[in-house]
A protein has these predicted regions:
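Electropositive
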Residues: 1-85
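Flexible, acidic/histidine-containing loops and adjacent segments that form or flank the divalent-metal
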Residues: 119
Length: 120
């Protein structure tokens, strides 16, 4: 997903990537929200129709060769943004056209201790 980074479900999380102190409690907290992000994403993409789009301001592929894209419903709901709003992801440190909006969504989630921002 373009512009967002969720905690890992299959490997250890590094709390410092999320601005959190490194502790067992925070690693466990991030693992919990990794599973919630996975469930949220699964439900989102199981809708009848979703659209995938790339961004001309961003690289098409990430460090692991994965396609980087926005995922939207036909009604215009954006998965990437919803993950940030819910506190299931952080803004990724790359260039893309929705960065300003995504930063704002992340900041609001942090201020309201949503999702992973309630860790620590």
């Amino acid at each position: 997903l373009l512009g967002v980074d969720t905690p890992e479900t299959s490997s250890a999380n590094n709390p410092s990537e999320y601005g959190l102190r490194d502790s067992l409690e925070n690693r466990e907290c991030l693992s919990k929200y990794a599973l919630e992000a996975k469930s949220f994403t699964s439900k989102f993409v199981q809708r009848e129709t979703i659209e995938i789009s790339t961004d001309s301001d961003a690289d098409r592929r990430g460090d692991y060769g994965r396609l980087l894209a926005y995922v939207d419903t036909v009604e215009g709901e954006n998965l990437n943004a919803r993950l940030l709003e819910s506190g299931y992801a952080r803004v990724y440190s790359s260039e893309f056209s929705k960065r300003k909006k995504f930063n704002s969504l992340e900041e609001t989630a942090m201020e309201n201790d949503r999702g992973l921002w309630s860790c620590d």
